[in-house]
Amino acid sequence: MVISKLATNCSRISNAQWYKTVMMCRPKYFDVCHHLLNAHMEMKIPVKKGLAAKQWENAYNTLHANNVKVELLEPQQGLPDMVFTANAGIVHGNIAVVSSFGAVPRQPETQHHIHFFKDRGFEVIIPSDHNVQIEGCGDFMPTHDGENYFVAYGFRSAFKAYAFIKDALSLPKDRLHHMKLMDPHFYHIDTALMSLTRGHLMYYPGAFDKESEKKILDIGSHKVIPIDRQDAMDFACNSVNFIDNDEHILVGNKFSNDLKRKLNDFGYKVIETPYEQFLLAGGSIRCSVLDIGKSDLYENE
C-alpha cells in the first residue's frame, strides 16, 4: 500500500453532490444467521425474506425516482451481510479505502469490494495492518461542507483507524475528529449521527461519550438536532440525505411525528420507506447505500 502519492489528492465534496452515484447490493442471500455481530442480531425473530426483498426494492426505487444513480454489487451466496454496502469502504475523490473487517463472517466480502472498485477505475487502498479494523462509512462521517470528518471506534472499527484514515486520505488532523461509541445498539457512527445537507447534525446523545458529544455540539453549533432513543432505535440517523431539484430529501425507515415536523421546519422533505426487516440485522437504508461519487464530482481545494 502506498499512501504518500495521495497527498496531493485531498478534496471535498459539496453537499449538492452527495449520493449522486451509489453502490447497493440486492439482498438475495440476506439473513440474520450470525449471532450477535451487533446488539440487534438476537435471532429471536426470523427474517421474512420476501418482505426484505420488497423493502429493499422500494428503497432502491425511491432513490432512483429522485435521480440517484445506483451501481449494483453482485450478491454472493454465504455472505448475508453484503446488502450493507456502506461498510464496504470509504470513497474520497478517486480513492477507495477498502474496509478491513474485524467480524470474521464479513471478511470474505472484501475481495468482492476490491473488484467492484477496481472495475470502476478507483485507486484502491487496503490496510496492511490486520489490527486496523475499519468498517467503511459505517464509522466515517463527513460534514455537509467537507470541512470536518468524524471517525468512530468502540465496537467495530479500531482506535488505530483514525490515524490510518488521516494518512490514507491526507486529511488535516484538526478536521478529523475521533469519536467514542458507548452503547452497543449504536455500534457504528452512522446509526447515531447524521450530517445533513442544510448543515445540521442530527444525533442521538446516548450513543457517545461526553467528549465526543461535545465535538458534535461545537461543530454543529446552533444547527444540532438531538433525537430521542425511540427515533434512534428506529434508525432515523441511518437515512440517506441528498439534494434533487433544489429539494433537500431525507429517505429513511421511520421518523416520529415530532422529528418529522422538526425536519420539515428546517427545510427537509422526509420520505419514509419501511425497512424493518433489515433492522433485525442492525442496519437501515444508509447502511445499504455507499456514496461512490467519482472524482469529477468533487471540488479540489
Regions flagged by a language model, labelled:
Residues 2-301:
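The feature marks the mature, well-folded catalytic cores of soluble enzymes
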